[in-house]
Structure formats: structure tokens, C-alpha cells
């Protein structure tokens, strides 16, 4: 059964038009199209900004952000997995939820204008467990904002469309003045992933 599922996933992956297009354009991953769509709809990333990309590897969002902020801005990428270098991107190897990693980030920039997070928890396929893991991860990322996000800063975070998401959105509304829930066209249709775009951090 495991091999059948793996073969099905590989077949779907390589027939995906966004996977094909990302290879054709030499993007680091199909996630490039997601951040591009979010950016075009919301105009979040601007020249001169400092961006923190949490869970950055293989670097699709970091490279995209680097091009948007330009040489007057800066991108800090953080992941537990190594990532190939990108111009104007400072990569920090480490777990964002550990104090030592936050200290390393603060050595580059004390606070940032935008936090991006496209990471997912380990998925089991059991809804009750997966929903709980998503909300736990989302809450932990929201907590990171206290240490690293500037006042009036912005957050783009991946989440999971479920009943629990309403309560999490209320939490975000306590910290940000405005939020949007967004599902990019480039997300697979069967996927329940959504993106929360939050602006004007209240600090």
C-alpha cells in the first residue's frame, strides 16, 4: 500500500503543470507560484524591506523575496535543512523555535518587516491529529512575531482549512489589524492548505 501511495504521489507530482513550469523556469520549487500569486493580490513585499522566511529550504520563497526587496532590502532564511546560497539572502541553519536560532537571526537584523512561513507539520492522514498539529504549529509561529516582527509588520502563514482555523484567526486578529484567508490557484485542488495574510502588527 505504501508503494502504491508513493507511486501515485510521484505520478501526480510530475504531471502537475506548476511542477513542470517551475522546472522550465528553473525555480527552486512550485511554491514560487504561490508566493507570486499572494504578492500580486496583496502587494506585501516591497523594495527595502527585511523579510524572514521560516522553513525556507529549498529556497523558492527566499529567492522570490530577494528579487522583490532588491539590494536595499534583506532576506533572512531559516531552516533545519541546508539550502543552496541565494544572493542577498542570509541563511541560518537551525530550529526557529529554539532561543539560539532567534539570537542568530537578531544578529543579522533585530526585527523584520515581514515573516513568511510555508512549512507544514508532519501529516498522518488522521484529521483530528493533523488539525491539532497545524494549529499548534501556527500558534508557535504567531508567538515568534513577538520577538522578531516590527510594529505594523506583516505575516504570511500556511495553515489548514478546518473548524479550528476560525479560533486561530481570532487570535491573529488580536495581534494584527487586518487578515485575509487566501487559497492560491497553484495549490493542488485536493489540498486543504490555505494561506493567512495578516498586516499591521499591533505589537
Curated annotation (Swiss-Prot):
Name the Enzyme Commission number(s) assigned to this protein: 2.1.1.166
Where in or outside the cell is it found? Answer: Cytoplasm
- One annotated GO molecular function: rRNA (uridine-2'-O-)-methyltransferase activity
Name the keywords, alphabetized. Answer: Cytoplasm, Methyltransferase, rRNA processing, S-adenosyl-L-methionine, Transferase
State the active site. 158 (proton acceptor)
Q: Which reaction does it catalyse?
A: uridine(2552) in 23S rRNA + S-adenosyl-L-methionine = 2'-O-methyluridine(2552) in 23S rRNA + S-adenosyl-L-homocysteine + H(+)
| An annotated GO cellular component | cytoplasm
- Entry-linked SUPFAM superfamilies: S-adenosyl-L-methionine-dependent methyltransferases
Predominantly, its location class is cytoplasm
Entries under InterPro entries matching the protein:
RNA_methyltr_RlmE (IPR050082), RNA_MeTrfase_FtsJ_dom (IPR002877), rRNA-MeTfrase_E (IPR015507), SAM-dependent_MTases_sf (IPR029063)
Q: Where does S-adenosyl-L-methionine bind?
A: 59, 61, 79, 95, 118
Task: Outline what the protein does.
Answer: Specifically methylates the uridine in position 2552 of 23S rRNA at the 2'-O position of the ribose in the fully assembled 50S ribosomal subunit.
* UniProt record similarity statement: Belongs to the class I-like SAM-binding methyltransferase superfamily. RNA methyltransferase RlmE family.
PANTHER family on file:
RIBOSOMAL RNA METHYLTRANSFERASE, RRNA METHYLTRANSFERASE 2, MITOCHONDRIAL
Name used for this protein in its record: Ribosomal RNA large subunit methyltransferase E
User: Origin organism of this chain?
Assistant: Wigglesworthia glossinidia brevipalpis
Q: What is the lineage of its organism?
A: Bacteria, Pseudomonadati, Pseudomonadota, Gammaproteobacteria, Enterobacterales
The protein's gene is named rlmE
Amino acid at each position: 500500500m505504501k508503494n502504491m501511495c508513493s507511486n501515485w504521489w510521484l505520478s501526480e507530482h510530475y504531471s502537475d503543470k506548476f511542477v513542470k513550469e517551475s522546472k522550465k523556469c528553473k525555480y527552486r520549487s512550485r511554491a514560487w507560484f504561490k508566493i507570486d500569486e499572494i504578492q500580486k493580490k496583496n502587494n506585501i513585499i516591497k523594495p527595502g524591506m527585511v523579510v524572514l522566511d521560516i522553513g525556507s529550504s529549498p529556497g523558492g520563497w527566499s529567492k522570490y523575496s530577494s528579487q522583490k526587496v532588491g539590494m536595499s532590502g534583506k532576506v533572512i532564511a531559516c531552516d533545519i535543512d541546508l539550502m543552496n546560497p541565494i544572493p542577498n539572502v542570509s541563511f541560518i541553519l537551525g530550529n526557529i523555535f529554539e532561543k539560539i536560532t532567534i539570537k542568530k537571526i537578531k544578529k543579522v537584523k533585530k526585527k523584520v518587516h515581514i515573516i513568511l512561513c510555508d512549512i507544514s507539520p508532519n501529516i498522518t492522514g488522521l484529521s483530528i491529529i493533523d488539525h491539532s498539529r497545524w494549529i499548534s504549529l501556527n500558534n508557535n509561529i504567531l508567538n515568534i512575531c513577538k520577538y522578531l516582527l516590527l510594529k505594523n509588520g506583516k505575516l504570511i502563514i500556511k495553515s489548514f482549512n478546518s473548524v479550528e482555523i476560525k479560533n486561530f484567526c481570532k487570535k491573529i486578529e488580536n495581534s494584527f489589524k487586518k487578515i485575509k484567508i487566501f487559497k492560491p490557484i497553484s495549490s493542488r485542488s485536493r489540498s486543504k492548505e490555505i494561506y493567512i495574510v495578516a498586516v499591521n502588527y499591533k505589537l
